[in-house]
Amino acid sequence: MQTTAEKTVLITGANVGLGKDIARQLASRPETARIYLACRNQDRATAAKADLEAKAGRPIFDIVLMDVSDPGSVRAGLAGVDGSIDAVVMNAGGMGGKTPMALTADGATYMFAQNVLGHVVLLETLLAEERLGEVAVFAGSEAARGIPKMGFKRPSFDSNSADELATVIDGSYFARGKPDVNLAYGQAKLIGILWMAYLARQYPDRRFISVSPGNTTGTQAPNDLALPLRIAAKYVMPRLGIAHMAGPRSSVHLL
């Protein structure tokens, strides 16, 4: 691990919430030389960059336009990044917006594409091009093991086969009933975690880590929840949850 200012880090979903605060905390480390803010919206990315540079007191941030729900956008964004990247933080994701079970052009649900597919393209491209230096961190969720009291059932499968997991990717898992968006989210995060474990076996010289930030306040994830949960997230959870700056710390300490 570098001790001089030469470490480069790429963070997805870096213009707001956990991703932005991960960038802020990393910028306070003297060994951090460059932070790529991978964001899908230019205006929001520009505003985040200006705010982060003002707080850091040094111009170490670059914007990479990238929509992780679109593999083509991920490839295009990554093509604009020169050289290797020491650490990747795959933070972008969420509950899939207003149409989480709609299919993208690639045949995956928007839920799965947003949380997993784009990150698969990102990380495996870096690995294929031998451009990942040290570590990749995937933002998991407690939903991957179920949160019954919050309406997130524990993901379970009959066979755990590749074919069965593929039904989560294209949404056909719910073909015989009404989709359970909370369950679909947990399933997506679980598959992402299993994928990271696979990569850890394939590339023992690098570190592949899945980490849940916990019930962290200040994120955009609750925006797509059902109304009762949105209200609870806005007014109740800030009093019970982990402080906003504490959640990102679990990822920062791994880099």
Language model features: what each stretch is:
Residues 1-217:
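Rossmann-fold NAD(P)H-dependent dehydrogenase/reductase core
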Residues 234-255:
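C-terminal helical subdomain
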Residues 152-155, 217-236:
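A glycine/serine/threonine-rich, flexible loop-to-helix segment
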